[in-house]
Amino acid sequence: VSRNAWIIFAVICAAVLGTLVFVARQNRIDVGDVNTNKIITASEANGNIADHVYGSDAGKTILVEYGDFQCPACRSAFPLLTLLKIEFKDDLTFIFRNSPLTQIHPNAKAAAAAAEAAGLQGKFWEMHDKLFEKQDEWASAAAEKRLSFFVSMAKEAGVKDIEKFKADIESKRVNDKITYDLALARKDGVNSTPTIFLDGKRIDSETWADTEKFKSMIQESINKHKKDDDKKAEKKADDKEKAK
C-alpha cells in the first residue's frame, strides 16, 4: 500500500471519528423538557448563544425554521421566508435554528459556524442572508478554501473584527450552539431541511411553498392570539370591577 493511500485512509478515519464524536455529543444533550415552540435563551448548554430571532421578541405567533445553509431547498425557501418575516415582523416571532445535514452537505456545519461567529458580533442575520444569496459560490468549495469565502461574506455583512470571527468559527462556544440546535431538531423529528413549524405544528412543504396559503395561516394565527389576548384583558377588567 502506497504512502499516499495510507494518508488518504487516515484522513477518512479522522473524518469518520469526528462525525461519530459530534453525533455522540448531540445524543448526550438532554432537551427532553425544552419547549421548542418558544425562544430558547442563552445557557451553558448552547454556548450561551440564544435563539436567533427576527421580528417581535414577544410575538405569540411563532415560526421556526430548521435550516442548512448548503441546502438548495433552503436556498429556494429563503426569499419566501424573508418576505414573511418582514411582512409580519410586528406580530411574528421568526426563529432560525441550525440543522446542517453534514452527510450530504460537507460545508454546511462550517457555514453554520460562520453565521454563529458573525452573530457574536451582532451580524447573524446579515451573514445568514449572505450565505444563502451566495450559496453557489461556496457550497462546493474545498475545505481548505471555504474560509476565504466566509471571510469575504463576513466583511460584506459588516463584521468588524475578522480575526475574532475566524477564531469564533473554530470555538467550542459556537460548536456547542450548533450541537444544541441539532439536539432540538432531533427532538422535533427533523430529518430534512428546511423543516418549518408554525405555533409548534409542523408545516408540510406543499403548504408553506404556497405563499398566499401560508400567509393566510400566519395571519389567522396572529388574529387568534390577539382575540385571546382581548378576552383575557376583558376578563381581567371584569374581575377588577367585581372586586370593587
Model-based region annotation:
Residues 64-70, 75-155, 186-188, 207, ...:
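Structural alpha/beta surface segment adjacent to cysteine/selenocysteine redox centers
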Residues 56-58, 106, 190-191:
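A generic fold-level signal
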Residues 44-61, 86:
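A short beta-strand-turn-helix
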Residues 26-41:
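Ser/Thr/Pro/Gly-rich low-complexity linker/stalk segments immediately outside membranes or between
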Residues 47-52, 80-81, 182-183:
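A generic local structural motif
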Residues 53-54, 138, 203:
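Short clusters of hydrophobic/aromatic residues that line enzyme substrate/ligand-binding pockets
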Residues 1-25, 152-244:
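C-terminal cap of thioredoxin/glutaredoxin-like
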Residues 59-62, 90, 192-194:
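Envelope-exposed proteins and targeting segments
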